[in-house]
Amino acid sequence: MKSKTFVFSLLLMTFVCIISGCMDRMPYNFNGKVSRYPNAKIVNIMRLNGGCYAELETIDSGEKVLEYYKNHMARTGWYIRIERRFKPFYLNDPENTAFLALFKGSEGLMINTYTPVNSGKTQIALFLGDTDV
């Protein structure tokens, strides 16, 4: 009887998590080090040897995404080593692309944003992994 109660409780907890949206959080591979961009949808997740990758999608501009991660990661001790913007954001070009490389200790985080013309949604690629330096 106890095993039935345990199984039922486990199923109920899983159902509650799905309903409440906790399955839409960043994958465990990011170990709470990188947050999901607010209201962004997780599109793809991969585990890599020594790291992980997540692809997100949002209706916000790439500039807004970049500023969020710059501020958020700086508050948690990461420093920016590389920041590149491939077209000025003020041109309001829908194909703007931006890239950030941040480091903390022996880990590196690369963030790439891109807004394709056909979808209008900004794609966010996050790569987190160990560094060799």
Where in this protein do the model-derived segments appear?
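An acidic-aromatic pocket/loop used at catalytic or ligand-binding sites
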Residues: C22-V133
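Bacterial N-terminal signal peptides
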Residues: S9-I18
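Bacterial N-terminal signal peptides that target proteins for export
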Residues: M1-S9
